[in-house]
């Protein structure tokens, strides 16, 4: 019966006294070991950060090489140039800067007007067509 109880409880009977507030085993070197462990963790973290910084520097050097090769600008540089252009446009203005009109937005309306005018001219008599084309 005792064997079954030990197996069921496992090693919990040893820890029961500690959980109930009993005396804990005091290791004289426990503080020293903990300090060594903390120092080892700190060193490992510093090594990891140094390795990461080195890898990131290598990646950035490779990215910059690709940017130089293909003439690509960094996102921050493009945003800074766009911001400078917006500020230059709005220096004398009292209102907020207008958004840039995408190419082709205003051109389509003029082309449609011309095509409508051309279709109207086609239906006019010859002398009126000559007079309007001039």
Curated annotation (Swiss-Prot):
Compositionally biased residues, Basic and acidic residues: 15-81
UniProt-annotated stretches for the region Disordered: 1-113
Compartments reported by the entry: Cytoplasm, Cytosol; Perikaryon; Presynapse
Keyword Signal part of the UniProt annotation: no
Region span, Interaction with the SNARE complex: 48-70
GO cellular component terms attached to this protein's record: cytosol; perikaryon; SNARE complex; terminal bouton
Coiled-coil regions listed in the entry: 29-69
MF annotations from Gene Ontology: syntaxin binding
Function: Positively regulates a late step in synaptic vesicle exocytosis. Organizes the SNAREs into a cross-linked zigzag topology that, when interposed between the vesicle and plasma membranes, is incompatible with fusion, thereby preventing SNAREs from releasing neurotransmitters until an action potential arrives at the synapse. Also involved in glucose-induced secretion of insulin by pancreatic beta-cells.
Similarity remark: Belongs to the complexin/synaphin family.
Protein known as: Complexin-1
Gene coding for it: CPLX1
């Amino acid at each position: 019966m005792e064997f079954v109880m030990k197996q069921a409880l496992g090693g919990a009977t040893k820890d029961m006294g500690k959980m109930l507030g009993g005396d804990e085993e005091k290791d004289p070197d426990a503080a020293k070991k903990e300090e060594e462990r903390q120092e080892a963790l700190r060193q490992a973290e510093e090594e990891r950060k140094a390795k990461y910084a080195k890898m990131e520097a290598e990646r950035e050097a490779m990215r910059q090489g690709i940017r130089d090769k293909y003439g690509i600008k960094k996102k921050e540089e493009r945003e800074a140039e766009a911001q400078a252009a917006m500020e230059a446009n709005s220096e004398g203005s009292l209102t907020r800067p207008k958004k840039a009109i995408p190419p082709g937005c205003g051109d389509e309306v003029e082309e449609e007007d011309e095509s409508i005018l051309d279709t109207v001219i086609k239906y006019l008599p010859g002398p009126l067509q000559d007079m309007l084309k001039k």
